[in-house]
A protein has these predicted regions:
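Single conserved position on a long alpha-helix in the C-terminal lobe of the eukaryotic protein kinase
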Residues: 1-56, 190-291
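Short, solvent-exposed secondary-structure boundary motifs
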Residues: 2-9, 80-95, 132-133, 179-192, ...
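Leucine-rich, highly hydrophobic segment in Treponema pallidum outer-membrane-associated proteins
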Residues: 17-19, 25-27, 43-156, 160-162, ...
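Extended non-catalytic domains of envelope/secretory-pathway proteins
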Residues: 51-81, 91, 129-229, 239, ...
């Protein structure tokens, strides 16, 4: 009684009374009746018991932006969780990490300026400490991300401080698992000092591709490559590819890596990708997006137009999920740019 319901874009339920408006979703048609019952409970609840009394809602109230979001990291597609959980203790559950962000849409770009925190004191302290590790991004690699790449993460760090954060991050460890058995990535990361970019051209489970570029303070680890060659797991090998450049293969995974004369680390899943990791792309991401990255402490770019593989095959599930969530609310978007908001 007194509640009205409507369905928005076939997947969002809108419920309203004289006092409140509530939108929930996305939800499949079969589950809409059940969700409607849940929404009635929320709309009936008084202020002391309802959703507005929850800690997450209280946090939402503190954000002054016209459009704001508070979400658990686990609500995001798994493939995009890494930047938000960087710095948390090793076995942190993504449900314990919360993102509070202000949002704005300009020129088809959803700009999300957020900070991560936790209601768990130990995790919250770790996140605050991690935020201090990031330095302003100079923009060395913003032109290296091609416009058709799926996602890119940009930062400026001192490797020795960043390494423990990377080691305790499950998503990044999974990303590097195959390579780490033969190449001492930890030592490579330790030598980083400056801008670093990880770009993922595509992100299907059976086709993990990535490039990594970084400014180094030194490349002493090049002296260890001969040892790495002799200690490869069975069926794998490391071979020379060019001056201070090598490739690793185990039949399934390939990884090309090397150091330029001016101490830049470059790497990629194939020869071309690796070489171009530190060079400007012929078709880089939009200049507006580049501008949003430079000067920030941490940035992630997600290309929403990248909805199918280069051969036109199926949609990327993670991207479809994100677009499905955002399009009904914001209209057609081309990209999402997330930047870490650092408290002054």
């Amino acid at each position: 009684k007194g509640f009205h319901f409507s369905v928005l874009k076939n997947s969002w339920l809108v419920g309203f009374s004289d006092q409140a408006l509530l939108v929930m979703g996305p939800v499949v048609a079969d589950a809409q009746a059940q969700l409607q019952q849940q929404m009635v409970k929320y709309l009936k609840a008084d202020e002391d018991e309802g959703i507005t009394a929850s800690p997450m809602f209280e946090r939402l109230e503190t954000i002054t932006s016209p459009m704001a979001m508070v979400a658990q990291a686990q609500a995001l597609p798994e493939k995009f969780v890494a930047p938000f959980t960087l710095g948390t203790p090793k076995d942190t559950d993504p449900s314990q990490v919360v993102i509070a962000a202000e949002m704005d849409v300009k020129d088809g770009i959803l700009q999300v300026k957020g900070e991560t925190f936790s209601f768990n004191k130990e995790i919250d302290e770790a996140l605050k400490k991690a935020a201090q590790t990031y330095r302003p991004i100079k923009g060395s690699y913003v032109k290296s991300m091609p416009a058709d790449a799926l996602a890119g993460i940009f930062m400026n760090v001192k490797g020795e401080q960043f390494l423990p954060m990377m080691q305790s991050n499950r998503s990044l460890q999974t990303l590097l698992m195959g390579i780490n058995q033969a190449i001492d990535m930890d030592n490579i990361i330790r030598s980083v000092d400056g801008d670093m970019a990880i770009v993922m051209p595509s992100l299907t489970d059976n086709n993990m591709q990535m490039t990594m570029a970084a400014k180094l303070s030194h490349a002493k680890w090049l002296g260890d490559v001969d040892y790495w060659k002799t200690s490869c797991p069975a069926g794998a090998k490391i071979a020379n590819w060019g001056k201070n450049a090598y490739f690793y293969t185990d039949g399934k995974t390939s990884f090309y890596f090397g150091v330029t004369d001016d101490k830049q680390f470059f790497s990629g899943s194939d020869q071309l990708m690796a070489q171009y990791a530190v060079k400007p792309s012929n078709h880089p991401i939009d200049a507006k997006i580049q501008k949003l990255i430079v000067g920030q402490k941490l940035a992630m770019v997600i290309n929403l137009a990248k909805s199918s593989g280069s051969d036109g095959s199926g949609k990327d599930d993670a991207i479809s999920t994100v677009t499905g969530l955002l399009t009904p609310v914001f209209g057609n978007l081309t990209s999402v740019v997330y930047t870490l908001k650092v408290k002054r």
